Swiss-Prot record:
N6-acetyllysine: residues carrying this PTM: K10, K15, K24
Keyword annotations from UniProtKB, A to Z: Acetylation, Chromosome, DNA-binding, Methylation, Nucleosome core, Nucleus, Phosphoprotein
Alphabetical list of InterPro entries matching this protein: Histone-fold, Histone_H2A/H2B/H3, Histone_H3/CENP-A
Species whose genome carries this gene: Dermasterias imbricata (Leather sea star)
Predominant location category: nucleus
Subcellular localization(s) per the UniProt record: Nucleus; Chromosome
A single cellular component GO annotation: nucleosome
Protein name: Histone H3, embryonic
């Protein structure tokens, strides 16, 4: 049978809306009263942007003090055993380390944006360090 072209027709009158069945009505009202409520979720990226604003406003250190101190002591053991640190020296190292990392991530983000991406990748960090002259 050959296909025929269908044309739009204006409806005349039509049927009255049917009443809902009892089971359908019960199904629609059940989640509102006794069902388990789904936990609220923000859209992807909303929480990330909120965290960016929060951390850009603040000045506190982001790496926990004790894990950083253990890392410093572990690295220092390679050079000399039985080395002791003043607490102010560890704090100065942590301030400098975090400042370096923040700057590196800023440059890394610029490299990702230059590549028309929003996600940073290891190659962006490598490029940023190479441009800075830290690693050939």
């Amino acid at each position: 049978m050959a296909r025929t072209k269908q044309t739009a027709r204006k409806s005349t009158g039509g049927k009255a809306p049917r009443k809902q069945l009892a089971t359908k009505a019960a199904r629609k009202s059940a989640p509102a009263t006794g069902g388990v409520k789904k936990p609220h979720r923000y859209r992807p990226g909303t929480v990330a942007l909120r965290e960016i604003r929060r951390y850009q406003k603040s000045t506190e250190l982001l790496i926990r003090k004790l894990p950083f101190q253990r890392l410093v002591r572990e690295i220092a053991q390679d050079f000399k055993t039985e080395l002791r640190f003043q607490s102010s020296a560890v704090m100065a190292l942590q301030e400098a380390s975090e400042a370096y990392l923040v700057g590196l991530f800023e440059d890394t983000n610029l490299c990702a944006i230059h590549a028309k991406r929003v996600t940073i990748m290891p190659k962006d960090i490598q490029l940023a360090r190479r441009i800075r002259g830290e690693r050939a």
